[in-house]
Amino acid sequence: MKIDILTLFPDMFAPLEHSIVGKAKDKGILEINYHNFRDNAEKARHVDDEPYGGGQGMLLRAQPIFDTFDKLNVTKPRVILLDPAGRTFNQAYAEELAQEEELVFICGHYEGYDERIKTLVTDEISLGDFVLTGGELAAMTIVDATVRLIPEVLGKEASHKDDSFSSGLLEFPQYTRPAEFRGMKVPDVLLSGHHVNIRRWRMEQSLRKTWERRPDLLENYDFTDEERQILEEIKSEGK
């Protein structure tokens, strides 16, 4: 995968050079480039200006973004604009983006964008119903969530399939050694070696956590008969 990020603050992306994204680069699975679009700004390197018609704040001008984009070595990329008004990012969206060969991120700043910038864009993405100072933190989040889903990045494909949301449910609790720590014990079933019971316990815990914390995720979930039965048992506990 090739990723190009248009930003006023390339240094903010230094953390991406570590951990999973850094390993993907080292393996040659990922190429990631940062482009400061101020370098392509006309008018004394000004990247923003006042909005026509008046209003608060400054808008990013179209010219620096377009000229920077024109210099990218891309063929048919998904072009992502980070915008609070965009489609909300989630695990399914990350899985969709992980199938792409080229991604371009446009990170805004100031009050907003000249609307004409959006003619370059295929996706407008938001992390949620809140506003950040710029698009850089959102871009880093999306890159990290997406890159870890690329085959061979994590080493084992199953490494992410049990993540919360990958299955459509929240992840079950997990434990490691010691079996007892400060009076807190690992559930006996996990120490039993009985794989059928362990699988059912994990299923029950995952369904329970989802029901208690994110019941909205269950609305479109494709239940097995066993899962449906377990969920009904969980619901009946509160009656």
From Swiss-Prot:
- The keyword Magnesium belongs to this UniProt entry's keyword annotation: no
Pfam family, any one: tRNA_m1G_MT
Catalysed reactions, semicolon-separated: guanosine(37) in tRNA + S-adenosyl-L-methionine = N(1)-methylguanosine(37) in tRNA + S-adenosyl-L-homocysteine + H(+)
The UniProt keywords, alphabetically, are:
Cytoplasm, Methyltransferase, S-adenosyl-L-methionine, Transferase, tRNA processing
Q: Which family does it belong to?
A: Belongs to the RNA methyltransferase TrmD family.
Instruction: Describe the function of this protein.
Output: Specifically methylates guanosine-37 in various tRNAs.
User: Known PANTHER family for this protein?
Assistant: TRNA (GUANINE-N(1)-)-METHYLTRANSFERASE (PTHR46417:SF1)
Q: What is this protein called?
A: tRNA (guanine-N(1)-)-methyltransferase
Q: What is the lineage of its organism?
A: Bacteria, Bacillati, Bacillota, Bacilli, Lactobacillales
